[in-house]
Amino acid sequence: MEYRRFDNTIVARIDRGEEVLEQVAAIAQAEQIKLASVQALGAVGEFTVGVFHTAEKQYHANSYAGDFEIVSLTGTINTMDGAFYTHLHMSAGNEKGEVFGGHLNRAVISATCEMVITVIDGRVDRFHSEEIGLNLFQF
């Protein structure tokens, strides 16, 4: 992975074999990001995404392997209990045009990933809501 920062914008290239969440965390830590939005596209060879079941208050994960194009990868970087926290969603399509997506648990790049991180001047933490079962923004 390589990246360059331009004021409040970080442009990154995540390389073949690298895992997306690990690389985003590395950038967040290196740049001391407290709040940011994330956008990306690229190609993945394997990924796991989840769908939150509100009645059960838990995610159900689905894993995929093969040639997939990232149709959309979006989300936020912020903090929870003082630690960096990344919340990303991803959709990826196969050669038949079928698209699979959800909350990103894991994604390994098969060719390249082009990412833009917009750093926001501020800080938003998270807290775990027992009622909802998710880590929500805390202002």
Feature map (PLM): residue ranges:
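N-terminal intrinsically disordered, cationic/polar leader segments
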Residues: 1-86, 91-139
